[in-house]
Amino acid sequence: MNKQSNPLRVGIGGPVGSGKTALCEALSKRMRDRYEMAVITNDIYTREDMEILLRADALPPERLMGVETGGCPHTAIREDASINLEAVARMTADFPELDLILIESGGDNLASTFSPELSDLTIYVIDVAGGEKVPRKGGPGITRAALLIINKIDLAPYVGANLEIMARDARKMRGERPFVFTNLHTGEGVDQVIDFIVKQGLLDEVRSQHHHA
């Protein structure tokens, strides 16, 4: 990874209901003791995702910020990311020691991506309930995200989705880029996601610079 912002900014995208908020919660709870973290959520008209994270005690309330994007959630992370860049700047000013900010996009479709000025590493979350064809449908989230997460693998038998076919299609669409199968309710696969963020985002280097500065 060439571009390194301080703190590391990880964009989390994916369709409504795929598990973006559940991922933010799981990452926060497993990483908060080791890294200084904050989360910014994007919702169309409410701050519902931020409220979910608050109720789950994912992070202290002052480290959670909800951005209301209005009618076009993808615009707020892509064409005009200023509302999110402003939120990042405020969080960084409030917590200068931050190592990591997770930015959860509003419910979007397969075509939305994060602006490179907003996100250093992008994770795209889809779920098995969408059907095994989702990886092969492609779209920038599936083909270009640094990491693809295929969530809710426990539902595969109920929706007739074959995980081997999904894995094969994900490899075909993504080439060398990695993907992970997860069940965010049980925590299965979360360690692989954390490992990816730490290594690809050079998080331990960021942390040692911060804490020895």
Swiss-Prot record:
Any GO CC annotation of this UniProt entry: cytoplasm
Broad class of the protein's primary localization: cytoplasm
UniProt keyword annotations, A-Z: Chaperone, Cytoplasm, GTP-binding, Nickel insertion, Nucleotide-binding
Name of a matching Pfam family: cobW
InterPro entries, alphabetized: CobW/HypB/UreG_nucleotide-bd, P-loop_NTPase, UreG
GO biological process: urea catabolic process
Localisation per UniProt entry: Cytoplasm
Gene3D superfamilies linked to this entry: P-loop containing nucleotide triphosphate hydrolases (3.40.50.300)
A GO MF term: GTP binding
Residues given in the record as GTP binding sites: 14-21
SUBUNIT field: Homodimer. UreD, UreF and UreG form a complex that acts as a GTP-hydrolysis-dependent molecular chaperone, activating the urease apoprotein by helping to assemble the nickel containing metallocenter of UreC. The UreE protein probably delivers the nickel.
Function: Facilitates the functional incorporation of the urease nickel metallocenter. This process requires GTP hydrolysis, probably effectuated by UreG.
Family classification: Belongs to the SIMIBI class G3E GTPase family. UreG subfamily.
Protein name: Urease accessory protein UreG
Organism encoding this protein: Nitrosospira multiformis (strain ATCC 25196 / NCIMB 11849 / C 71)
Recorded name of the encoding gene: ureG
